[in-house]
Amino acid sequence: MGPTASGKTALALELAEKHNCEIISVDSALIYRGMDIGSAKPSAEELARGPHRLIDIRDPAESYSAADFRADALREIEQIISMGKTPVLVGGTMMYFKALLEGLSPLPSADEAIRAEIQAEADANGWEALHEQLREIDPVSAERIHPNDPQRLSRAIEVYRISGKSLTELTQTKSAPLPYDVVQFAIAPRERKVLHELIGQRFRIMLEQGFIDEVAQLKARGDLHLDLPSMRCVGYRQCWQYLDGEFDYDTMVEKAVAATRQLAKRQLTWLRSWPELNWLESGAEGNLVTLMRQCR
């Protein structure tokens, strides 16, 4: 694991080439087809060196939850082990790692009719009124969820209306944790400044590779919009807004790089409190040797 632009893919490919391993992607952007440049999806050459599972498995119009990931990852892990190989999970979506390692609460699936009903109430009365509803049925979640966070607020109310139980009550029960021995590594530069520079460099390379054209093609489909999880991925939202004329090119670059740096900051916050984690420095010589030594 590690923040964006920290060198996870390069190390994973080295591991896959030199040892009997297969890579499973743990990345909420790489699951989407047609989102290659802005997600820093491994190139065709890199995928030939080390195939990645759970890449290009969803259309950008579709949703994909942590529960979906857990089910898919468990299936892939079992298959890789049955082949006599070692699965290597690589990515920066910490919620996916957490769901896989610790299990998930038995929450009901989304109900589009109830979601539409909640949205209609919000349009008529405002999200503050719905937040008061949540405070009555689930005061713990109401303290945690801000009235200006409609996605999480809607989900908490939806869960109650489907199940008759609060989100707090349901999240107190989890499925079984991962039934395998796991060695966990994080890779990142020692200095935040270095990571910030890497993020800026990588985004400029994405632009040179045709990222704006990629977003324009997605936009031209007509069925995608900025409220979809796929279009909330860093870089895509800012480029979409640029194409809509909301700001100029330089502002788009500034906003996209800033959003990516904020993502990296959140990822590092998760990792600093992550238990049983072995740290590696980005670009350091001997990372593979250190990793293999820890796995023995």
UniProtKB/Swiss-Prot annotation:
Organism of derivation: Shewanella sp. (strain ANA-3)
Region of interest (Interaction with substrate tRNA), ranges: 27-30, 151-155, 232-237
EC main group: transferase
BP GO annotations: tRNA modification
Gene3D superfamilies assigned: 1.10.20.140, P-loop containing nucleotide triphosphate hydrolases
Site, as annotated: Interaction with substrate tRNA: 93, 115
Family, as annotated: Belongs to the IPP transferase family.
Top-level taxon of origin: Bacteria
Pfam families in the cross-refs: IPPT (PF01715)
Binding site for substrate: 4-9
Protein name listed in UniProt: tRNA dimethylallyltransferase
Subunit structure, as described in the record: Monomer.
Cofactor dependency: Mg(2+)
Function description: Catalyzes the transfer of a dimethylallyl group onto the adenine at position 37 in tRNAs that read codons beginning with uridine, leading to the formation of N6-(dimethylallyl)adenosine (i(6)A).
Matching InterPro entries: Dimethylallyltransferase, IPT, P-loop_NTPase
Alphabetized UniProt keyword annotations: ATP-binding, Magnesium, Nucleotide-binding, Transferase, tRNA processing
Reaction it catalyzes: adenosine(37) in tRNA + dimethylallyl diphosphate = N(6)-dimethylallyladenosine(37) in tRNA + diphosphate
Residues binding ATP, per UniProt: 2-9
GO molecular function: ATP binding; tRNA dimethylallyltransferase activity
Enzyme Commission identifier(s): 2.5.1.75
Keyword Kinase attached: no
